[in-house]
Amino acid sequence: MKKEIRLLDVELRTPEDNDKMIVEGYAVTFNSPATHGYTEIINEHALDNTDMSDVPLKYNHEDSHLIMARTRNKSLELAKDEKGLFIRAELIDTQSNKDIYKSIKAGLIDKMSFAFTVRGDEYDYDTDTRTITDIDKLYDVSVVDMPFYDSTSVYARGENDEFLERRSELRKEHEEQMKEEERKARLKEAKDKLLKRLG
């Protein structure tokens, strides 16, 4: 399974707290179609069996940057609800976190993204829609300052090439199946005409 990354245009906010640097937002949203060459939807049960045992909050998914918060030490909380995966992080007191926090508060950073692997998905040939039904592991959630991506874009860095290849194969299989069904229909029509003449 290859790691995939998705960027979401969701609300990222800093609740008023005079003593702590708190960041909240949705890292994953359910049943919200995103289009990027094909339509993708994350099913509301996709996180039911996901490994979220040690999830860090990062900046732009960068490993070189200090981790901002983490579930392991309870500075990052994850809560699944009917909308998606809600995160609440208490940032530790470092200069880099202070800078990021100020940028979020000023609205300069207002996007979230998540890195994950897929265990189960479905593909609808007619609507060209991929539905992610089972996310295997959540590797990290990130606050990101990428240029604005609207609902027609996804930040994927090419990690979903494997799915795109499989999608092409599935489309080819579907087309072959349709041709076979069309051939059978023509044969049946010819047979019916012949029987009608003989009758």
Model regions and ranges:
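Charged/polar low-complexity intrinsically disordered segments, enriched in acidic residues
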Residues: 158-199
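Residue microenvironments linked to proteolytic maturation
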Residues: 9-15, 22, 74-173
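Short glycine-rich, polar/acidic loop-and-turn segments at beta strand-coil junctions
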Residues: 27-31, 61-63, 91-93
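Polar/acidic, low-complexity leader/linker segments enriched in S/T/G and N/D
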Residues: 1-54, 167-172, 184-189
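Flexible loop/turn segments at secondary-structure boundaries
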Residues: 32-34, 65-66, 121-123
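A glycine-rich, hydrophobic loop/mini-helix early in the fold
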Residues: 52-89
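A general structural signal for short secondary-structure boundary/capping elements
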Residues: 2-3, 28, 70-76, 135, ...
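Short helix/loop capping segments that flank catalytic or ligand/cofactor-binding pockets
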Residues: 34-36, 67, 149-152
